[in-house]
Amino acid sequence: MTTLHNLSYGNTPLHNERPEIASSQIVNQTLGQFRGESVQIVSGTLQSIADMAEEVTFVFSERKELSLDKRKLSDSQARVSDVEEQVNQYLSKVPELEQKQNVSELLSLLSNSPNISLSQLKAYLEGKSEEPSEQFKMLCGLRDALKGRPELAHLSHLVEQALVSMAEEQGETIVLGARITPEAYRESQSGVNPLQPLRDTYRDAVMGYQGIYAIWSDLQKRFPNGDIDSVILFLQKALSADLQSQQSGSGREKLGIVINDLQKLKEFGSVSDQVKGFWQFFSEGKTNGVRPF
């Protein structure tokens, strides 16, 4: 029979080992089998094994947490890069808007606010532009301007936080706003229909369409002095292009419903104009003897 303990192999004590110590360490022993032989393990060895197992478990758990954190950071950075690429692709087609984004002025203002918080930074961006895609674009410009500025490391970290937050929470909103900007900008150049309501109406139609009554109500509120017929035509063209780019799926079905409803609104608008004209005809007294009621 083989005996194992934490001081020696076999029953013979090591050189200069005190016998009474060795015997006291083998008082509590565990009997078992190892490769066909009987094995005795002293209690001190069992405790050492347990301690090592606990330590190894802790190390692996710690490494797993670090790995998970790194993976989350990598995913967040990838999301920011994806959104940034699409924003640059679409907004670069409207250089007039990019010229309004004075990053150096923004950097100068923020660098004088060492204790600015994330919510304050977002509020400041919203004050510069109500469009999320433009806010994201400004943040990207700030991030690039802060490279090589170690004295503004706190601001650089804050900007990175804001980019990750916007990409994760408003990614689709940002991309849709950027995607429709070139067409919306051209439509707004007539001076009748403003740019931002055009972007908002398109985005709502894609992300959260609430039905024909809701969109008609939105059109009335957002374009009180605008040309609603031209807005409907603008939406039809934009959504039809989106529809053609989608091969199948629920998104395609939803777009089809919105486009059909817009056509109904267009026809309704035409009838509404006729009714208004008819009513004006009578109100001006051009009845030729015909009574309105």
From Swiss-Prot:
The keyword Membrane applies. Pfam families: HrpJ. It comes from the Bacteria. Gene3D superfamilies: 1.10.150.630, 6.10.250.670. Keywords: Calcium, Cell outer membrane, Membrane, Plasmid, Virulence. It is found in: Cell outer membrane. SUPFAM superfamilies: Type III secretion system domain. Its main location: membrane. One of its GO terms (biological process) is negative regulation of protein secretion. Plays a major role in regulation of the low-calcium response. Seems to sense the calcium concentration and to transmit a signal to shut off yop transcription when the calcium concentration is high. Belongs to the HrpJ/YopN family. This is Outer membrane protein YopN. The lineage of its organism: Bacteria, Pseudomonadati, Pseudomonadota, Gammaproteobacteria, Enterobacterales. The gene is yopN.
